[in-house]
């Protein structure tokens, strides 16, 4: 673990962080679209449980 810094000699840190940001954004967008396209509705379920 002490020589882990050498990974940045192989990979350019800017490209790694940009790629990580793009990946996380696309993953979040995909998760949101999957949840929105499902029949799951937390508001109606909470109202049914709460009796409102």
From Swiss-Prot:
Cell membrane among keywords: yes
PROSITE patterns named among the record's database cross-references: ANTENNA_COMP_ALPHA
Positions contributing to a bacteriochlorophyll binding: 32
Periplasmic side of membrane: 37-52
Alphabetic keyword roster: Antenna complex, Bacteriochlorophyll, Cell inner membrane, Cell membrane, Chlorophyll, Chromophore, Light-harvesting polypeptide, Magnesium, Membrane, Metal-binding, Transmembrane, Transmembrane helix
SUPFAM superfamilies: Light-harvesting complex subunits (SSF56918)
Compartments, record wording: Cell inner membrane
GO biological process: photosynthesis, light reaction
Entry's family note: Belongs to the antenna complex alpha subunit family.
Cytoplasmic side: 1-15
Gene this chain is encoded by: pufA
GO CC annotations, alphabetized: organelle inner membrane; plasma membrane; plasma membrane light-harvesting complex
Keyword 4Fe-4S: no
GO MF annotation list: bacteriochlorophyll binding; electron transporter, transferring electrons within the cyclic electron transport pathway of photosynthesis activity; metal ion binding
InterPro entries: Antenna_a/b, Antenna_alpha, Antenna_alpha_CS, Light-harvesting_complex
One Pfam family per UniProt: LHC
Name this protein carries in UniProt: Light-harvesting protein B-870 alpha chain
Membrane topology: Single-pass type II membrane protein
Subunit annotation: The core complex is formed by different alpha and beta chains, binding bacteriochlorophyll molecules, and arranged most probably in tetrameric structures disposed around the reaction center. The non-pigmented gamma chains may constitute additional components.
Reported function: Antenna complexes are light-harvesting systems, which transfer the excitation energy to the reaction centers.
Spans traversing the lipid bilayer: 16-36
């Amino acid at each position: 673990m002490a020589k882990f810094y050498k990974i940045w000699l192989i990979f350019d840190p800017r490209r790694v962080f940009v790629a990580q940001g793009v990946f996380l954004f696309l993953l979040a967008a995909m998760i949101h679209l999957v949840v929105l396209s499902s029949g799951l509705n937390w508001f109606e379920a909470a109202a049914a449980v709460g009796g409102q």
